[in-house]
């Protein structure tokens, strides 16, 4: 597991964890706790997450019912020789996607009117 943290334009910090497959030819990039969902906002956040999943092709948003948070996940396959380039690109795209989607998530929670 590799952990990286960056500041975005709308949210900071963005903590990313890279989970590499046992064959070292795939990776799952996960950003846990993008937003904490208060009681009574589950339906609103599920609608927002579904909308974001329909909009973003390579990122998956999901609501964790156990800890009441939203996670963003991106996966990629690669050859050993291009792992650095692919993981860097994945990280940049993930930061952009989270930055772009954060206002929608916060609006669903009633933080932005």
Where do the model's predicted regions map?
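Ser/Thr-rich, low-complexity intrinsically disordered terminal regions
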Residues: 1-34
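A short acidic/glycine-rich loop-to-helix N-cap element
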Residues: 78-90
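Short, highly charged C-terminal tails/helix-capping segments
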Residues: 106-113
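Intrinsically disordered, low-complexity acidic/polar segments
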Residues: 13, 38, 81-83
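Short, internal acidic amphipathic alpha-helical interface segments
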Residues: 30-69
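Long, contiguous binding/interaction regions
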Residues: 87, 95-100, 104-105
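Short strand-loop junctions, especially beta-strand C-caps/beta-turns
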Residues: 32-34, 75-77, 81
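Short, aliphatic-rich beta-strand segments
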Residues: 70-74
